[in-house]
Amino acid sequence: MSESGPQTGAITHTEPETQFDELDVDTPLVGIIMGSKSDMPEMEKAGEILAEKGIHFEVRVMSAHREPDTVADYCRNARMRGLRVIIAGAGLSAALPGVAAAHSDLPVIGVPLSSRLSAMGGLDAILSIVQMPPGVPVACVGLDNARNAGHLAARILSG
């Protein structure tokens, strides 16, 4: 194997549009998004963990089903705005984490959320997040466990 350059199948790295060192100290590094305002009580827990660790974050409510263009625009522009990780919480069919991953090269952490409307007790949300097609990775924490999403985001940022 030649050491003169990338080989077939080699992974190459390109610099992001915004350099980490150039970011304002108050620039959010983590975007916390959720499909509905009713998801806020659980998803706020990710923010609490990030705040404890001194990590700036932003919170948005946007539905992959009702506002697909909003989700796509948010995720496409996330890196340019300084985000480094996206935490996406959703219940039922839980499309939001996968849609976020499809529109961003940032790490996406999916938080499956239980719902009184679910006939499967949240298993539907878990399976929707973990069963992604090749090339669209989403990390998944436990059901209703946004705290672990906050911890995982912090670990990703520390690496």
Please provide the spans of the model-predicted regions.
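N-terminal beta-loop-helix "entrance" segment that forms/cooperates
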Residues: 59-81
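Glycine-rich phosphate-binding loop
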Residues: 74-113
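Glycine-rich phosphate/diphosphate-binding loop of Rossmann-like nucleotide-binding domains
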Residues: 25-66
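Short, glycine-/small-residue-rich phosphate/pyrophosphate-handling segment
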Residues: 117-159
